[in-house]
């Protein structure tokens, strides 16, 4: 088979709860206005006016929306009920940071694969709105993020890795500020080392953010004249710090004709990201969003040509109209014709043998929304099992419709932490949504951390990860009786981490993640295959040949087999990061994207592109799942979460410095 087929279920950290819309704030009247329509999430906008003070309004914006299942660029105009799709890169499932200037649309896309692993896919493109011709402005082999166009449109700035590979960082990216003429994108100048999210003031001043040596994210400034010849010897320049320590400042937007910049801030004693205006002349801040919406996060400001309006995106709120529920399951665009992609409002999906239901974990805190959830595969009805217990990772018995195996206890803890494998038997035929269950624990309480159960295709055995020896290795037990009556057999043994196993539908192999090639590094994992009898262990090489620096940088988890046993599905760090993580809410591992590959490592194909962490994938037990329109009115009786904008700021941004 040249390409895999089937339905993939997965989760995206935080994404279902964003509810982003684009807003503008009139600085004269302090009136806030929503510019987008409340469908899907809408973000990373820019005003689409002509670029001079006489056109200083907020009537048109270009922005990114995921309303078609992937990020694409749209134009919203006052008085029009629907936004207009703008040109996109053919085959691209990721567009970001659009700018409309002088008849050209600039945007980031990630549709062209680099020629090596751990090189980002993001690059800058432009589209002529008249002829719709798409041009790549980033040199092949280079990676660019976060473009900005100067006031006249003559110059472009980007945050760029150049041709350097991604170094594995995902808090502050090691990008430089690069400038080039719009008329000649091949002649690029590094004007400042170390920085991101550039913004122009005129044609000769660029502001950008950077994490300073004292630990505070701050705004920096460089001023220069672009060389008329090819003598770039005076570059890069030493930038001037603009914002003071004591407050985090990110994602600046220069206000034309002044020394002011709009910035997103995080302050001591404050839980929310807000937009403020910083006056570099008086060195003072003016808060603009906190007085209006003190308990909402606000992201990525942008400014109108005459500086009257400041825009941003935030959770739309519960009173503005638009989508107000979180779909249990929603479709996502797929790059492979034979694969259906479905995002789940939860983690660790596992489908029933007949394909009618999906088991998952909604939350990993028992008091919040723990236990095991079950939802119909069409996204409608939902049930809760073991409601007040912490559970994670599920495996539906392939031979019993009403039996699920799960892990009960805290997730991602030490080998000695008590976590147990449980067999849950239940009946969904009654009217109750909180379903009474028969829970049978299959592992002894004194055996430490037992988790990630996977059932054999005949339903007789479970393979799982256990820390009972002091290391996390794989074991096999009887699926009905566990280790109490059925005994237990150790499958792998060593001072490393073997985890997240998956049993082949052909019953001949078990796939798992392991750092056994480098046991001293708990951040790198590769895929391994082993037979159920313990023979035939081999590593699946994806990033490079055995012993290469690239292959030992792999962080690959949550591997599982396709329905025919010919393909592996997993989440990996092979493509770096797609957008600047500091511009988003919290993502634990923003490099996490979904891939498929054959069992020998060939045929590697990427499935997702965005600035989020995508993970815990699983193949649905049926080829295709029928869903209704995710943006239509919620059907009566559907059990879905209310959209409340419940997400966190990046946990690695601390004000305790």
Question: Where is each model-derived feature located?
Answer:
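Sequence signature of WD/YWTD-type beta-propeller architectures
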Residues: 1-657
């Amino acid at each position: 088979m040249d390409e895999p087929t089937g339905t993939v279920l997965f989760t995206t950290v935080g994404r279902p709860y964003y509810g982003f819309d684009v807003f503008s704030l009139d600085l004269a009247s302090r009136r806030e206005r929503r510019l987008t329509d409340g469908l899907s999430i809408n973000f990373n906008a820019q005003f689409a006016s002509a670029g001079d003070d006489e056109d200083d309004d907020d009537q048109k914006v270009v922005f990114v929306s995921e309303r078609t299942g992937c990020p694409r660029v749209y134009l919203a105009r006052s008085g029009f009920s629907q936004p207009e799709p703008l040109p996109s890169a053919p085959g691209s499932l990721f567009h970001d940071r659009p700018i409309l200037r002088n008849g050209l649309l600039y945007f980031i896309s990630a549709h062209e694969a680099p020629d090596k692993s751990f090189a980002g896919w993001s690059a800058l493109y432009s589209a002529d709105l008249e002829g719709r011709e798409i041009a790549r402005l980033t040199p092949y082999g280079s990676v660019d993020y976060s473009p900005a166009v100067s006031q006249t449109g003559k110059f472009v700035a980007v945050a760029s890795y150049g041709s350097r590979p991604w170094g594995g960082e995902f808090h502050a990216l090691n990008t430089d500020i690069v400038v080039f003429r719009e008329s000649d994108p091949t002649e690029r100048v590094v004007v400042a080392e170390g920085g991101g999210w550039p913004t122009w003031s005129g044609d000769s001043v660029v502001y950008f953010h950077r994490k300073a040596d004292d630990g505070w994210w701050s705004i920096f400034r460089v001023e220069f004249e672009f060389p008329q010849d090819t003598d770039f010897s005076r570059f890069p320049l030493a930038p001037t710090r603009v914002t003071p320590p004591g407050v985090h400042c990110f994602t600046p937007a220069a206000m034309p004709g002044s020394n002011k910049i709009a910035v997103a801030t995080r302050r001591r004693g404050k839980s929310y990201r807000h937009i403020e205006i910083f006056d570099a002349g008086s060195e003072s801040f003016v808060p603009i969003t906190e007085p209006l919406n003190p308990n909402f996060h606000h992201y990525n400001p942008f400014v109108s040509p005459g500086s009257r309006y400041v825009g941003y995106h935030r959770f739309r709120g519960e009173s503005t109209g638009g989508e107000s529920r979180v779909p249990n399951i929603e479709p996502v665009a797929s790059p492979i014709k034979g694969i259906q992609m479905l995002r789940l409002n939860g983690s660790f999906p596992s489908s029933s043998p007949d394909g009618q239901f999906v088991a998952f974990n909604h939350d990993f805190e028992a008091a919040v929304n723990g236990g095991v959830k079950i939802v119909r595969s069409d996204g409608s009805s939902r049930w809760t099992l073991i409601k007040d217990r912490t559970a994670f990772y599920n495996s539906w018995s392939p031979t019993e419709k009403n039996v699920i195996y799960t892990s009960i206890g805290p997730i991602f803890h030490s080998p000695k932490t008590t976590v147990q494998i449980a067999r849950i038997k239940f009946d969904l035929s009654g009217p109750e949504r909180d379903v009474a269950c028969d829970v049978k624990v299959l592992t002894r309480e004194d055996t430490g951390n037992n988790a990630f159960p996977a059932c054999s295709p005949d339903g007789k055995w479970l393979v799982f990860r256990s820390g009972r020896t002091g290391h996390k290795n794989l074991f096999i037990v009887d699926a009905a009786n566990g280790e109490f009556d059925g005994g237990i057999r150790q499958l792998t043994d060593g001072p490393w981490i073997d985890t997240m196993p998956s049993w082949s539908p052909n019953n001949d192999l078990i796939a798992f993640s392991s750092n056994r090639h480098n046991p001293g590094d708990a951040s790198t994992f590769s895929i391994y295959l082993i037979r159920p009898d313990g023979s035939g262990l081999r590593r699946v090489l994806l990033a490079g040949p055995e012993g290469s620096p690239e292959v030992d940088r792999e962080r690959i988890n949550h591997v599982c087999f396709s329905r025919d046993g010919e393909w592996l599905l997993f989440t990996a760090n092979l493509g770096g990061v797609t957008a600047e993580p500091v511009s988003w809410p919290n993502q634990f591992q923003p490099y996490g994207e979904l891939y498929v590959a054959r069992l020998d490592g060939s045929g590697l194909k990427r499935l997702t592109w965005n600035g989020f962490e995508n993970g815990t994938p699983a193949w649905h037990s049926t080829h295709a799942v029928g869903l209704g329109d995710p943006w239509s009115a919620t059907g009566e009786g559907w059990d879905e979460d209310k959209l409340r904008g419940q997400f966190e700021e990046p946990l690695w941004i601390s004000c305790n410095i």
